[in-house]
Amino acid sequence: MNLVLMGLPGAGKGTQGERIVEDYGIPHISTGDMFRAAMKEETPLGLEAKSYIDKGELVPDEVTIGIVKERLGKDDCERGFLLDGFPRTVAQAEALENILEEYGKPIDYVINIKVDKDSLMERLTGRRICSVCGTTYHLVFNPPKTPGVCDKDGGDLYQRADDNEETVSKRLEVNMKQTQPLLDFYSEKGYLVNVNGQQDINDVYKDVKELLGGLSK
């Protein structure tokens, strides 16, 4: 079961990803985790990535793609994988196709958790975080018992600077522009499946499970 998981910020991609890997026993591979592991293991590519990250620069595609190739070649990916956060561009998607062709592991589905912009705005601007323990709340979906106060330790809740309306709106616009060519690429390939992310979390996952039902665990 070889999957790519997509979705704009706030779509609930992380939640669905956790459930998929738990139920199907495949590794959840995110770009950040891959970089951290490669740097910790001090692989040549990991050290190269670190040199860019330490300077605050973007890691070049060839290094990122090399790290992805190393990761997908590990034993725990024999029965499949869930890629999250990669690819981000059509060039990366084409490189991924080449890697998977070499490994004989074609993509089964690219699952896009689809949520409209207004709903994403509500989800992202409603987030509040405890200043003491870091617990995340949401004014609509998961409010604290007492407004502005953490249930666990009474700490003050705050809104992250990048969760305000203007910043969130800009972030979503940028993400939409970047993501659309990738969605078009995978749609043309016949891999793309849109899942309605507007529903309750459990209903979203029910749709995902129905989709994956035809694939062997």
UniProtKB/Swiss-Prot annotation:
Positions of AMP binding: 31, 36, 57-59, 85-88, 92, 160, 171
Region (LID): 126-163
Subcellular location: Cytoplasm
Annotated residues for binding of ATP: 10-15, 127, 136-137, 199
UniProt pathway: Purine metabolism; AMP biosynthesis via salvage pathway; AMP from ADP: step 1/1
Catalytic activity from the UniProt record: AMP + ATP = 2 ADP
Keywords in alphabetical order: ATP-binding, Cytoplasm, Kinase, Metal-binding, Nucleotide biosynthesis, Nucleotide-binding, Transferase, Zinc
Complex formation: Monomer.
Protein name (database record): Adenylate kinase
Lineage of producing organism: Bacteria, Bacillati, Bacillota, Bacilli, Bacillales
